[in-house]
Amino acid sequence: MRIWTVFFFVLLMCPSVAEAQTAEILLQKVTEALSAGKADYAVSLFRQATAANAEQAEIYYWTQLNKNTDTSLRMAGELAAHFKDYRVYDKAYLFYMELLQAHPDDVQTLVACAETQLMRGDEDDARRLYEKVLGLDADNLQANIFLGNYYFLQAENRKKRLEEDFKHLASPTRMQYARYRNGLSDIFAGGYEKAKACLQRVLQLFPSSSEAGHILERIKKLEAELK
């Protein structure tokens, strides 16, 4: 019985050992390719090593590479994409930040980093990143979808709190009612209008988006009520 237990344990261990050995061989070849000036080949080998054993590839990145080269940035991109695909979002974020330090206005990296931040639960930073994306590319569909929904939901929450506070007033004075209406106008200008701009752009880019159309109808109705 003990023999079979050991046998199965060895079988289970073999794939991970083989992957580690494969990654080690590939990373040795990465070093050789870099020494020979074969950057594209080195990146291809590094991608394979990352797939075989991402932990070894990560250690290689931090300990063996000159970080001041375009090739090392491409390898950081490989690690970022790999960790994001495998839902290791903390590490993915770390490598996206490596990329953004070198190229802070790269839209593709900003979008990927924003997605990662959402998965990490940092909605505020995702919003900041998507806002930067729109500043660089006003037609970015993903940023417009996220921000349109984000601004709308934030405005809805603010409006709900304002309405609840107003309902608690047994006999509101004209001054209190005026403040309530001004509060609604401020929420509309600071939230609903921004959501409207993003979602209108979504419909221009993606006319079949029923969700964007539905939210825009709700904003239009509220706008009419405020006039």
Predicted segments with their positions:
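N-terminal leader/linker segments that initiate helical-solenoid repeat arrays
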Residues: 18-63, 69-74
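Conserved structural position within tetratricopeptide repeats
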Residues: 51, 98-101, 131-135, 197, ...
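Short coil turns that delineate tetratricopeptide repeat
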Residues: 54, 70, 104, 138-139, ...
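TPR alpha-solenoid repeat register
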Residues: 58-60, 75, 109, 143, ...
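Canonical tetratricopeptide repeat
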Residues: 62, 78, 112, 146, ...
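Short coil/linker segments at helix-helix boundaries
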Residues: 62-66, 153-198
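Short coil/turn linking the two alpha-helices of tandem helical-hairpin repeats
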Residues: 119-121, 148, 153-162, 223-227
